[in-house]
Amino acid sequence: MNTALNTEKHRNVFYCIGNHDLVKGKYGEELFESIYGPVYYSFDAGNVHYVVTPMPGGDHAPGYTSDDVCRWLKNDLAHIRPGTPVVVFNHDLLTYEDTFIFKSKNAGSINLNEYNLKAWVYGHWHINYMKKQGDVYSVCTSSLDKGGIDHSTTAFRVMHVDSKGDFTSELRYTYLDKNICIASPAGVMASGVLP
C-alpha cells in the first residue's frame, strides 16, 4: 500500500477511492491503484480497526464487484479480536438506517453493527454533516478545495479517537485568516414579494 507521509507531523495518509477516481483504463481503479495502492484494505491504530472500502461505482466501471468486497470484508473482520472498535471509510454513505449491512449480489451480506462499528466516514455528499444512526455515527465532510455543495465553507475534519473507538470531531477551516462575512437576507418589497 502506498501511503503518503505528512513530513511535518510524520503521519501516514490513507486514501479512499471515490466515484470520480474510477477513470478510463483497463478497469476503473487502475490509475488509482498505480498511484495509491489497493482500493480496499484495513489497518489498526491503537485499539481501533480501520477499514477502507471502495465506492461501488463511478465514472467508469470498476474491476471489483460487491461480491469481491463482501468476501474480503467478511474475512477481514473474522480476524479481529471480538469487541474491537471498527471505523469504516467509504466515499458514500452505506445506509440511512440504524443497521449498517454491507450487501453483495452473490456473497451474502455482513451486519457491521455486530462488529462494534463506531463510525462510517464518507465524503460523497460534499457537506459537513454528522448524524447518529443507532449506535453508529455517520460522518461527512465537505470538499477541502471548494467547500460543500450546500455552500458550507471549505474545511477538513480532525477526529480524535480513543482506545474504545469513541471520538471527538472538529472542523478546521481553510483559506480563512481573521475573516468574517455577514449575510443579511433582502427585505420584502412594498408589493409583498421578495426582490
Regions found by a protein language model. Give the residues of each.
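Extended active-site neighborhood of metal-dependent phosphoesterases/phosphodiesterases
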Residues: 1-85, 105-119, 127-163, 167-170
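Short, well-ordered beta-to-alpha junction loops that form the rim of enzyme active sites
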Residues: 55, 89-93, 124
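Short, catalytically relevant binding-site loops at active-site mouths
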Residues: 58, 93-96, 127, 176
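Active-site His/acidic residue clusters
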Residues: 98-102
